[in-house]
Amino acid sequence: MRISLACLAALCALPAGVMAQDASVHDKPAVRGSIIANLLQDHDNPFLLYPYESNYLLYTWTSDLNKEAIRSYDWAENARKDEVKFQLSLAFPLWRGILGDNSLLGASYTQKSWWQLSNSKESAPFRETNYEPQLFLGFATDYQFAGWTLRDIEMGYNHDSNGRSDPTSRSWNRLYARLMAQNGNWLVEVKPWYVVGSTDDNPDITKYMGYYRLKVGYQLGEAILSAQGQYNWNTGYGGAELGVSYPITKHVRAYTQIYSGYGESLIDYNFNQTRVGVGLMLNDLF
């Protein structure tokens, strides 16, 4: 489906210079579910943008709100458990064919926000926003083993922060790899990482976030079922997200999401909660 600028504006307010009016978004992959194969498709429009992670908008409710982490905000005690959660995730190919026809140097930007929209008493503040740019080298492959086809190999640098100052600043930097394989209607992706640089704002983040993310997807008719999570086997801490989406128009899907555990956001990396959300999605795993 093609993501219109109007939809993106509804998800997140970005500087007009970044999202120029003649920019368009391409999200019809050459290989179903393959981010790299999608980015390798060549088009004449230099402002063409591609989806990276899923793009969605949800109304959510959480079992417990982490007021302790935001106690420095003057509205913390009045923070509400219901929030609008949305994710904007786009990618751009910087250099196709950098190491052969099926390779590219690319960049992506993912932003996830938790918005206290119903909290009119406190002027509807954003409780948390996570900014996640990446620079990566990607390869589209067709290696086969035991019925599975390895589609994506990606290696890169990831920065993830909430853009806050002390005492609510949270950030970490990682070197990562991403491998995605398919078998029929199944998709499996693993993304291990290695933390680099300072983690002074959150020195124990790997205790709760671990060293990898595992994602599994299955297409059942027109519905897409997804599960993803991170886990530290040494500490027993982690978090998981379950999702179901179904098309309601050509370009929009109904989406239900459940997150349970630690690390839904950076400010909540060491906080355990369960969040349920319903809303709309522009692109899923397939």
From Swiss-Prot:
It is an enzyme of class 3 (hydrolase). Binds 1 Ca(2+) ion per monomer. In the dimeric form the Ca(2+) is bound by different amino acids with binding of each Ca(2+) shared with ligands coming from each monomer. The Ca(2+) ion may have a role in catalysis. It is found in: Cell outer membrane. GO terms for biological process: lipid catabolic process. Homodimer; dimerization is reversible, and the dimeric form is the active one. CDD domains: OMPLA. The chain crosses the membrane at residues 50-62, 82-96, 103-115, 126-145, 148-161, 171-183, 186-195, 214-220, 223-231, 239-247, 253-262, 272-283. It is a multi-pass membrane protein. Residues 63-81, 116-125, 162-170, 196-213, 232-238, 263-271 are extracellular. The keyword Transmembrane applies. It comes from Klebsiella pneumoniae. Residues 21-49, 97-102, 146-147, 184-185, 221-222, 248-252, 284-286 are periplasmic. This is Phospholipase A1.
